[in-house]
Design a protein with these regions (language model features):
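Internal, well-ordered alpha/beta segment that forms a basic, Gly-enriched binding/recognition surface
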Residues: 1-5
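Sequence/fold signature of self-assembling virion shell proteins
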Residues: 6, 25-65, 94-211
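Short, glycine/acidic-rich hinge or "gate" loops at secondary-structure transitions
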Residues: 10-26
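A Trp-anchored, charged/polar loop motif used as the substrate-binding/catalytic surface
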Residues: 60-77
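Short helix-terminating capping/connector loops at secondary-structure junctions
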Residues: 79-81
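Long, repeat-rich segments with strong aromatic
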Residues: 83-91, 95-96
């Protein structure tokens, strides 16, 4: 079941297009979140596509300004300062952790941290980002399941999702089935049938790759 859950996570977070079972070797396949949000023509009606201002395209030097622009772009579509969630791959998460902590000088970079003298730990992670147009909870994406992208920063993809505008719909809930033992030992299988529902692609943001 754990492996099935990981397969589901990788499929939902993927960039693949949908496929319809045809009885001739093509299996049904849901459209991955990356394909829903890439703004490409033909995936969804033009009025509901993810705006270009909500996509940090490949090669973008990611900064706090760009993150704020993505959040503001989502706000312009929904009109609501929603609680958003950023599902970030490892490279993107580390870049965000350095927001407002590094400054460049002519000779060196200076890192600023808050340190409690009574504590033996220094916190460098960022779990919550508050902006003018929404509060973003930042969570780790499973590195085995996030889409493989190319950019200056390895593993730099992420999804800025609005929980009110997506869902997972199950046809067959996840479960296990035991098959009869015909003399070869115990056997069975686990299965699940579901699809990803993206109710408004414009209500989300997409970080494809960063440099």
């Amino acid at each position: 079941i754990r492996e099935l859950k990981r397969d589901i996570e990788a499929t939902i977070a993927g960039t693949q297009d949908l496929a319809v079972e045809n009885g001739a070797g093509v299996a049904s396949q849901l459209r991955g979140l990356g394909d829903w949000l890439d703004g490409a023509a033909g995936n969804v009606p033009a009025a509901f596509q993810t705006p270009a201002s909500s996509i940090a395209a490949t090669g973008t030097a990611f900064s706090e300004t760009i993150l704020n622009n993505l959040i503001s772009s989502v706000f312009r579509v929904t009109g609501s300062a929603s609680n958003l969630m950023l599902v970030a791959d490892t490279g993107l998460r580390r870049v965000i952790a350095d927001f407002a902590r590094t400054t460049s000088s002519a000779t060196d970079n200076v890192r600023t941290v808050n340190y409690d003298g009574d504590s033996g730990s220094i916190k460098l992670s960022v779990d919550l980002y508050e902006s003018d147009h929404g509060v973003v909870s930042i969570v780790n994406g499973n590195p085995d399941c996030m889409p493989a992208v190319t950019g200056g920063v390895a593993n730099g993809s992420g999804y800025l999702v609005n929980p009110e505008y997506y869902g997972v719909h199950e046809l067959i809930p996840m479960g296990s089935t035991r098959l009869p033992n015909l003399g070869g030992g115990e056997r069975g299988f686990v299965d699940c049938a579901l699809t990803l529902g993206v109710y408004h692609p414009g209500a989300h943001g997409y970080i494809q790759a960063i440099s």
